[in-house]
């Protein structure tokens, strides 16, 4: 389950699907001797403040714990953490296009809110990278750019209807002003792999006696990676990103026919 407001009202359903459901799928895959499993998480799992993000954070814990129970030669289990995939089902750009078609103002939650943005092709690239380079228990993150909601809305308006109005409606249940793909704690162990970060899991076993005498002295070499400190796209850059999407190309073609 990925809809933030829905999970706020039905948190147990988020747990059943995102946490218990993940464990069920992993157990079945291990029993079937599946060689590689890539689980899809979200930036909302880092410093979660809503039910959806919390359930995804627990899902990540299940994935890492499960990876310790099986030899990576038998089954490799990795996790990818995403930002927003542009024009995915239930996302804001298709909503805005529908509002423009209906002659309604574009509804904006908070203009200065920032979000990571990536195309479906870039999302697939992250999964393929995880298959090729991930080790069991890893969390892998792509160095995605971000933009403000105001910039994203302006890009959509300029592509479809520059005279369309906007209306600020306020933040919805469980939303954050910015999202995080890597926490400052994860940055202490994250490996910079060019266009990606790899966060290896903690391989130490559950030996409480060692916890009193041994620790990890690794210090952060990276800062928290969030949608405020990554590269922020301007309107023209967002338009270029949108125009590369087949969904936008199709919607623009239909819109121009009606004009």
Model regions: which residues?
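Strand-loop microenvironment adjacent to phosphate/nucleotide-handling motifs in alpha/beta enzyme folds
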Residues: 25, 61, 65-259
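A short helix->loop->beta-strand "cap" motif at the edges of active sites that frequently abuts
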Residues: 32-36, 74-75
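SDR active-site strand-loop-helix element
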Residues: 1, 37-42, 80-82
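NAD(P)H-binding glycine-rich loop region in Rossmannoid oxidoreductase-like domains
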Residues: 1-16
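Conserved catalytic-site region of short-chain dehydrogenase/reductase
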Residues: 31, 43-48, 85-87
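Active-site helix of classical SDR
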Residues: 55
């Amino acid at each position: 389950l990925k809809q933030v407001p829905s999970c706020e009202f039905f948190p147990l359903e988020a747990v059943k699907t995102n946490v218990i459901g993940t464990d069920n799928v992993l157990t079945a895959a291990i029993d079937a001797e599946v060689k590689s499993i890539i689980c899809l998480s979200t930036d909302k799992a880092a410093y979660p403040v809503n039910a959806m993000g919390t359930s995804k954070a627990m899902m990540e814990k299940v994935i890492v714990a499960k990876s310790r129970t099986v030899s990576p030669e038998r089954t490799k289990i990795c996790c990818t953490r995403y930002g927003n995939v542009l024009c995915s089902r239930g996302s804001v750009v298709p909503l805005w296009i529908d509002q423009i078609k209906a002659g309604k103002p574009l509804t904006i939650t908070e203009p200065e809110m920032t979000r990571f943005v990536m195309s479906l092709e870039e999302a697939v690239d992250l999964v393929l990278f995880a298959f090729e380079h991930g080790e069991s228990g890893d969390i892998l993150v792509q160095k995605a750019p971000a933009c403000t909601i105001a910039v994203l809305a302006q890009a959509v308006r300029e592509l479809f209807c520059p005279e369309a109005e906007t209306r600020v409606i306020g933040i919805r249940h469980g939303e954050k002003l910015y999202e995080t793909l890597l926490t400052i704690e994860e940055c202490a162990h994250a490996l910079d792999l060019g266009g990606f970060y790899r966060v290896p899991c903690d391989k130490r076993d559950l030996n409480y006696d060692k916890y009193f005498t041994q620790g990890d002295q690794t210090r952060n070499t990276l800062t928290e990676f969030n949608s405020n400190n990554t590269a922020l796209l301007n309107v023209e850059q967002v338009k270029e990103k949108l125009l590369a999407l087949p969904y936008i190309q199709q919607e623009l073609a239909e819109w121009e026919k009606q004009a």
